[in-house]
Curated annotation (Swiss-Prot):
GO biological process: fusion of sperm to egg plasma membrane involved in single fertilization
Keyword Secreted (UniProt): yes
Protein source organism: Homo sapiens (Human)
Signal sequence segment: 1-21
Cell compartment(s), UniProt: Secreted
Protein name as catalogued: Sperm acrosome-associated protein 5
Length: 159
């Protein structure tokens, strides 16, 4: 009986989250990331963040992916439940001190705060496999084409 209660609460939470979710348009997300201070943060430009978010979630704040190890990835940046947030299921370090379900809505400042913490580590954006595979070392100017902003990048990261 307790298991059914957990299922009902989880489904109700997911339904509420879905109502408040958002799939961002590229330039809309670029402006949001710039306002949040990610343009040039730790040497990465908004193009880096857009590229990574595109390959992680398709700019979908409600995207959840499940891993073979039992952990899950949440939100626009696909933050992992074993390390960065608590989903109530996976044993976690919860290094961003947050509930994973808080990453599934249109309000992405908490996602950005956690992503800033991750990128501040020695791995930088390399912590995301998608950034290493699809974004690192590539011309990212296409990600900002048609958006009203200027690229700030660190030449040490993007030679």
């Amino acid at each position: 009986m307790k298991a059914w209660g957990t299922v009902v609460v989880t489904l109700a939470t997911l339904m509420v989250v879905t109502v408040d979710a958002k799939i961002y348009e590229r330039c809309e997300l670029a402006a949001r990331l710039e306002r949040a201070g990610l343009n040039g943060y730790k040497g990465y430009g908004v193009g880096d963040w857009l590229c990574m978010a595109h390959y992680e979630s398709g700019f979908d704040t409600a995207f959840v992916d499940h891993n073979p190890d039992g952990s899950s990835e949440y939100g626009i940046f696909q933050l992992n439940s074993a390390w960065w947030c608590d989903n109530g299921i996976t044993p976690t370090k919860n290094l961003c001190h947050m509930d994973c379900h808080d990453l599934l809505n249109r309000h992405i400042l908490d996602d950005i705060r956690c992503a800033k913490q991750i990128v501040s580590s020695q791995n930088g954006l390399s912590a995301w496999t998608s950034w290493r595979l699809h974004c690192s070392g590539h011309d990212l100017s296409e990600w900002l084409k048609g958006c009203d902003m200027h690229v700030k990048i660190d030449p040490k990261i993007h030679p």
